[in-house]
C-alpha cells in the first residue's frame, strides 16, 4: 500500500516530510487558527500496521501446549482444561449407565443399552479426535468463553452487592451492642495483687469496734415516719430562731434516729431523751461569739480553707465540722463582703454599669490606677548648687520671661571645659580675650559707666564684689571690668533682666 504524497502547504509554511519548526503567521494568531494537519501527517508517517508479525504469533501459539498458552495469557492452573471436563462428563455418564443397567436386568433390555453405550462412547471419541485435530479452534473458543464469563459474573456480582446494600439500608435494624452494659458482679471485679493490701485477712483496720448508727430492719417505715414527726413537733417554749415554724416535709433527723437506736428502738424513751437535748436533736448551730468570728477570719487569711489548721490554731472551742458549717453561713453574710473587700478573698466581683460596654478597658484602667497608687512617689531632687548660685548672681526673681521660657535655665550653664575652649560669646568673632572691645563699652556697645548708675545693678555689683573670692573657681559666668576697675554685669544678663521687667527706658538712658 503506497503512501499518498502530501505536497500541500499550510498557511504557516510547507508541510513536508522534513522536520522544521512551525512558524504561525499573524492571521493565525489573530483568528486563533488551529492547524490539525500536523497530527494527520504524523499518523501517515507511522505507516500501516505490520500484520505479518501477528500471523506469526498466532501460528506459534497454535503449536504451543495448552498449559503454556494459559500461563502466557495470565491464566494459571485454576482454569480447568477441556479434556478434564470431558473426562468428568464421561465418568458421570458411565455411572448413570451402570445404575440404569442394574435397574433393567429383569427387563431384558441390557443388549440395547450396551449398544447405546458403545455408540455414545464412539461419538465422544470422535469428538475428542476432532478437538485434538483442531487445537487452535478449541483454545480460541475456550479463551473467549473464559474471558467473557468472569466479566459477566463480576458485573452481576456488583449489581447484586448494590442491591443487597440497598436492602440492608432500607431494612436496617440496629444491633444491641450500643446499649451500655452494667458491669456488676464477680466477673467485673478487679484482681488486687497481694502486695498492695496492707492488712491481713483477720486484722482490724483500727482498734475501736464499729458502732451501729441505724438499722432499718427493726421498725417499719411508717412507724419511723411517725417518730420523726413527733421528734420535730414544737413544744411552744422555743425562742428566737427556734420559734420559726418548719415546713410540712419530714426532716431526716439523724440525731433522733441515733437516739432511737441507742434506746433499742423504743420510741417513747427516745422522745423523752430528745426533749432534754433539743439543740442536739434539731442540730441547731450555736451562736458564735465575736472573738470566735475574728479568729476564724484570721485563720482564713493565714491558712486558707484548711479548716483543720484553723480549728487547731485559731478556733479551738469549735470542731472542724462546726467550722465548715459556719464557713458556709458566714460566706452568705455581710461580714464576708467586708472581709473580701479588705483581703481580696475569693473571686473579684465587678459591678455592671449600664453606661459601660467595654469592661476590659475598665479592668485595665482600674489595674493601672491601683498600680499607680501603690507606686511610691519619687523624692524631690535637690536643686543644683550651681543653679542657685547663678540665680543669685543674676538677681532675677521671676523664672520665666514674656515668651514663657526660663530666663536662666540649667541648660545655659557651661562647664569648665566648655568655658575654656569656647571663650567669650560676642556679636563679633569669638576670642579668648576676657576684656571688652573698648574700655568704656561692653560687648553689645553699651557704656558701662551709665549702667552702674542703676540702683539694681549697683546692688548686684556690690554683691558680686563681696563674693568674688568665693566664685573665682566657677568660670561659668563671665566677669567684665570697666575702666574704673569695677565689675559690671554681662550684656546678656542685663538684657534678660531688662526684658523680664519690661524696662526698655533704661536701655535708652544708657544709650544717651
Curated annotation (Swiss-Prot):
Pfam entry (one): Myb_DNA-binding
Highest taxon of source: Eukaryota
UniProt biased composition (Acidic residues): 37-46, 83-105, 160-173
Gene3D superfamilies recorded: Homeodomain-like
Biased composition (Low complexity): 1-16
Cellular component, GO annotation: cytoplasm; nucleoplasm; nucleus; protein-containing complex; transcription repressor complex
Organ and tissue specificity: Ubiquitously expressed, but at very low levels. However, consistent level of expression are observed in heart, testis, thyroid, ovary and adrenal gland. Transcripts are up-regulated in breast carcinoma cell lines and tumor.
UniProt region (Disordered), positions on chain: 1-63, 75-173, 366-512
Modified residues (Phosphoserine): 10, 141, 160, 166, 367, 369, 377, 483, 488, 491
Polar residues compositional bias, start-end: 129-144, 396-409, 482-494
Domain SANT, chain residue ranges per copy: 283-335
Modified residues (Phosphotyrosine): 155
Cross-link (Glycyl lysine isopeptide (Lys-Gly) (interchain with G-Cter in SUMO2)): 239, 420
Any single GO BP term: regulation of DNA-templated transcription
Transmembrane segments: none
Domain ELM2: start-end pairs: 180-278
Chain spans, region Interaction with HDAC1: 180-284
Keyword list, A-Z: Cytoplasm, Isopeptide bond, Nucleus, Phosphoprotein, Repressor, Transcription, Transcription regulation, Ubl conjugation
Example GO molecular function: histone deacetylase binding
PANTHER family attached to this UniProt entry: MESODERM INDUCTION EARLY RESPONSE PROTEIN 1, METASTASIS-ASSOCIATED PROTEIN AND MESODERM INDUCTION EARLY RESPONSE PROTEIN
Summary of the function given for this chain in its UniProt record: Transcriptional repressor regulating the expression of a number of genes including SP1 target genes. Probably functions through recruitment of HDAC1 a histone deacetylase involved in chromatin silencing.
Subunit structure: Interacts with HDAC1. Part of a complex containing at least CDYL, MIER1, MIER2, HDAC1 and HDAC2.
Designated name of the protein: Mesoderm induction early response protein 1
Classification lineage: Eukaryota, Metazoa, Chordata, Craniata, Vertebrata
